[in-house]
């Protein structure tokens, strides 16, 4: 049964390069602090934007800290990680962590920069059901590709969620993309944007995670600092 209100948070926790155990603990702390049904994290948040980081498996015991936090708060965490499929291909992915399981929810479709040297594109748009709400997903470059946005919106989504890594100079583009996706999809948008330095030449990142209304208005936002959380409770527009 669909809940009339969905509380969603976009988090930008501290991240240590290639330290999945430490990063899982910081994710768990963010889940507990957010007090939200859905908590979205940045691209490759479990490893940092380290393009040679080993893949993370869904049964990795280091993720138990996040599972336990989700159980304690009745939350779903959408975390960024490299994953390896049964076919041997490696993807930039969004993992869905709940009290019951860890699963791959989405694989990035549109790769940028040096990513194609290591990663393969995902199979296409995907949707995740949380408390009756349909969440469409994207990762960084996906958010700027019209075909991806159109195909995801066509799945009939209520919320579009994405994990990002951007420089401070890219923040205006990040905000414009979110507002555009919201208006085109007629959906709420939650962008979790990396804060603090990370790999890939990102000495500075934008942070400024935020949540937008279907009209493209900002409902909640974090600053550029590490540890920020944007949180909003959004109401089912079907009731209007």
Model-derived features: positions:
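CN hydrolase (nitrilase-like) catalytic-core segments centered on the catalytic cysteine
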Residues: 62-76, 144-227
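Short beta-strand scaffold segments in enzyme catalytic cores
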Residues: 79-81, 92-96, 126, 191, ...
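Short glycine/acidic-enriched loop and turn motifs that connect beta-strands
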Residues: 16, 84-86, 197-198
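Active-site catalytic loop in hydrolytic enzyme cores
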Residues: 85-158, 167-176, 235
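Cys-nucleophile CN-hydrolase/nitrilase-fold catalytic domain and related Cys-dependent amidase chemistry
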Residues: 25-99, 168-187
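Extreme N-terminal starter segment of soluble prokaryotic enzymes
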Residues: 3-10
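Short hydrophobic-aromatic micro-motifs
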Residues: 39-40, 134-139, 161-162, 190
């Amino acid at each position: 049964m669909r809940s009339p209100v969905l509380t969603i948070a976009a988090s930008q926790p501290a991240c240590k390069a290639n330290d999945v155990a430490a990063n899982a603990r910081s994710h768990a702390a963010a889940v507990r602090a957010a007090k939200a049904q859905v908590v979205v994290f940045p691209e490759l948040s479990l490893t940092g934007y380290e393009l040679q980081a080993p893949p993370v498996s869904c049964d990795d015991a280091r993720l138990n800290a996040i599972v336990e936090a989700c159980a304690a708060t009745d939350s779903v965490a959408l975390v960024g990680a490299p994953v390896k499929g049964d076919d041997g291909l490696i993807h930039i992915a969004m993992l869905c962590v709940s009290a019951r399981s860890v699963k791959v929810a989405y694989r990035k479709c549109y790769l940028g920069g040096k990513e194609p040297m290591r990663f393969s594109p995902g199979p296409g748009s995907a949707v995740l059901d949380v408390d009756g709400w349909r969440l469409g997903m994207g990762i960084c470059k996906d958010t700027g590709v019209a075909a991806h946005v159109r195909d995801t919106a066509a799945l009939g989504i209520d919320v579009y969620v994405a994990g990002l890594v951007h420089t401070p100079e890219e923040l205006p583009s990040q905000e414009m993309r979110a507002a555009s996706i919201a208006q085109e999809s007629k959906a709420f948008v939650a962008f979790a944007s990396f804060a603090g330095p990370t790999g890939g030449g990102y000495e500075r990142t934008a942070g400024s995670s935020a949540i937008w209304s279907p009209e493209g208005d900002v409902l909640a936002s974090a600053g550029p600092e590490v540890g920020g959380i944007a949180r909003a409770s959004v109401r089912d527009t079907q009731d209007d």
